[in-house]
Amino acid sequence: MQTIASTLDCYYGTNCNSLWSLEEELSRKFSAYAKNYEFPKLHRSYFHSVERYCPVICSQLTWSHDGTSICGVFDDFGIRQYLIPEDPLVDHWVPFTRWFVNGSIISSVVHPRYSLYEEDSAYQTILCSSRDLPIKLYSLRSDSINETSLYHYSTVNEENEAFETAYSMTILQDTMHFMTGSVRNRITMYDYNRHKPIWQHQWTKQSCGKSSQKAIVSCFDEYNEVHDNVRFAGTYKTEVLRIDTRSTKSELISERDSLDSWSNGIYQVIKSDNGHYLYCIKRNAREIDVIDTRMLKSRINILELPFKIGKQKFKASLNSAKGLLIGSYDGQVACWDKDCIEFGGLDPLQTAGTGIKPTNNILISDENVRVNCIATNPVDPNTLAISTSTDKFADDEGMTLKTSVKLIRMH
């Protein structure tokens, strides 16, 4: 295991103003060394003149399609882009660009053709959702100021004229449309060039039960090469929905398993490369549910986690070389190899399994840190971008919150 780049101690602590100032100082020093190129100036937060305390944890990492940069969404309302160095860095890995929105980002999605070297500016974008606001489209171009959004999309419920928060978003394969998930199991489709939705669909009480009013579409299956016109979504009621994007049709295909009495909803759905299996990662759970897309209605196996996922989520990654990867509380990454993931952990004649332990564990850090997010380089699967931190919910007043973003290469 080799560390190629790390933010080191840049985001240690919770005094945002001090951390932002340190980041700006490190960026100035780095820019001074790069004499042949003028790096963009890091933008200031809307709250730079107000004393602000919160962890600067990266909650989402997205690679560019060409593997030359990553985009990170942070808890301090910041969006940062990092360039991938040609050689390992000894000093701090500082962001290439940094800008802020003026509120908490509930969900976001980067365009699948995103790259800092992309000439078409329509691909250099990110969609962001916040409470009580429209969905906003921002530019990821290095010369963008982002004082205002490029475009916005209505989230107003016309029945009560209230904003409905988009808790999940995904861009469709044609890259011209995107979908959102919100309360009452509502799924909405938008055209990038239209302010209002194209269509909306939600489950009725009859089809979803008495608690349908509280159901939230929390995630969509993640972008890969076998989406076709069918997408899947997870909910905080531990349900899985199947969506035909050619129409307004969606259907409930999997409900909470009768043996699952402790989990608190699905927050990530990963589809195997062959498109046959869904891996549903849940809050407050000790396992990952496996669902066969050809034989729906209930889980057919589970991946046994070596720990329990609590309030703070662990974002997993499907790696074309290593299989399914998910972080842990102790600096390790649990791994189920590619053969296991492509066949749902089942032998050829099996129709259901009894649970699969990790194939192996990969040590990422000698420190006792959480590996919050893992993202695989789409060009080189042996290179990972990871977000680490100490537990932000830990009840330890004397503990310094240590967060970082790292680039590592597996052997």
Curated annotation (Swiss-Prot):
Q: Name one GO biological process term.
A: RNA splicing
- Location of this chain's protein in the cell: Nucleus
Q: Which GO terms describe its cellular component?
A: nucleus
Record's keyword annotation contains Isomerase: no
Q: Which InterPro entries match?
A: SWT21/TCAB1_mRNA_Telomere, WD40/YVTN_repeat-like_dom_sf, WD40_repeat_dom_sf
> Keywords on this record?
mRNA processing, mRNA splicing, Nucleus
Q: Which domain of life is it from?
A: Eukaryota
Note whether Nucleus occurs among the keywords. Answer: yes
Coiled coil regions, renumbered to chain? none
* Function text: Involved in mRNA splicing. Helps to stabilize the U1 snRNP-5' splice site interaction.
Record's family? Belongs to the SWT21 family.
Subunit note:
Associates with snRNPs.
* Protein's name in the database: Protein SWT21
